[in-house]
Design a protein with these regions (language model features):
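Electron-transfer interface patches adjacent to heme c in soluble/periplasmic c-type cytochromes
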Residues: 25-46, 57-71, 75-133, 143-144, ...
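Bacterial N-terminal signal peptides that target proteins for export
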Residues: 1-9
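Hydrophobic, well-structured mid-protein blocks that either form specific transmembrane helices
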Residues: 134-141, 150-151
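Short, charged low-complexity linear segments at domain edges
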Residues: 36-53, 145-164
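Internal, well-ordered alpha-helical scaffold/interface segments
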Residues: 132, 136, 157, 161-165, ...
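Short alpha-helical "patches" and their helix-cap loops
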Residues: 5, 152-153, 265-269
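C-terminal segment of classical bacterial N-terminal signal peptides
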Residues: 14-23
């Protein structure tokens, strides 16, 4: 099934590229044309549908679904929950993003092992990730809503400030930080334009469209994956899955993106 899904997604990418040929010659943003065409038949929707099925499936040692998972608005209430994350959860006494909250519920409600979950959290060409699919489904339930990440709890504020510090801090063997690539307009790596995350409009366009389908990966990815890869590209120490660092950076970026209308899954290169 995963190979078939990957093949279908790749075929859709090729169709979109072919359909965009004439438009590319006239556009200043050829990759944007492709993304727009893909969004009409988004391969990422396959992950959303899988996530919906997995969410309601009786799974794990406890043979339970995730219908009692509380994403901040009450057990089982998904509409608008993603728009307010990361946020503080009293039961864990932590600020959590959607993925870390999903893992908490999979452990507590379904009896899964946290370490084992992390081993298969990121999908491959041969295997779709349940976590990535679940994150896409939960996020999709906030589509059309504005991001409204809170800072009302002290730990929410502390996490936000930690994320802000990390975003602007340069370190490691290359003296890189998030700000190195995402602090100015008109930067790019090969074919990839780099958004200026100090520009509110550009930042909102980014944070409101993750999780996203990546054509180069033939897979759907989450912000946890994106930040992990950023750290790898900066030659910094590997970030463990659901690291406090990734949650902190996500908290900073999502709060800065408040007011952006969510539309997931996005489509990226």
């Amino acid at each position: 099934m995963p190979r078939i899904v990957g093949g279908i997604a790749a075929f859709v990418v090729c169709l979109a590229a072919g359909s965009a040929t004439s438009a590319l010659a006239q556009s200043n943003d050829p990759l944007g044309v492709g993304r727009k065409l893909l969004a009409e038949d988004n391969p990422g929707d396959l992950w959303v549908e899988r996530g919906k099925r997995v969410f309601y499936e009786q799974r794990g040692p406890k043979r339970a679904s995730l219908e009692k998972c509380d994403f901040g608005l009450g057990p089982g209430k998904l509409e608008g929950a993603y728009a307010r994350m990361p946020r503080y959860f009293p039961d864990t006494d932590k600020v959590q993003d959607a993925e870390s909250r999903l893992v908490t519920c999979m452990v507590d409600l379904q009896g899964f092992n946290r370490v084992e979950i992390a081993k298969t959290a990121m999908g491959t060409l041969d295997r779709m990730s349940d976590i990535e699919a679940l994150a896409a489904y939960v996020a999709s339930k906030s589509n059309g809503m504005k991001m409204d990440v809170p800072l009302s709890h002290q730990k929410e504020y502390d996490t936000y400030k930690a994320g802000e510090y990390i975003f602007f801090r340069r370190n490691g063997p290359t003296d890189f930080g998030c700000i190195t690539c995402h602090g100015e307009n008109s930067k790019r790596i090969r074919l990839q334009d780099l958004p200026n995350m100090t520009d509110r409009q550009q930042l909102q366009a980014v944070v409101s469209t993750w999780p996203a389908y990546l054509g180069t990966q033939s897979n759907l990815r989450t912000m946890q994956w994106r930040l992990k890869i950023c750290y790898w590209q900066m030659r910094l120490p590997d970030l463990p899955y659901l690291s406090d660092v990734t949650v902190a950076i996500t908290s900073y970026l999502n709060y800065q993106g408040n007011g952006a209308v969510i539309g997931v899954p996005g489509v990226k290169r």
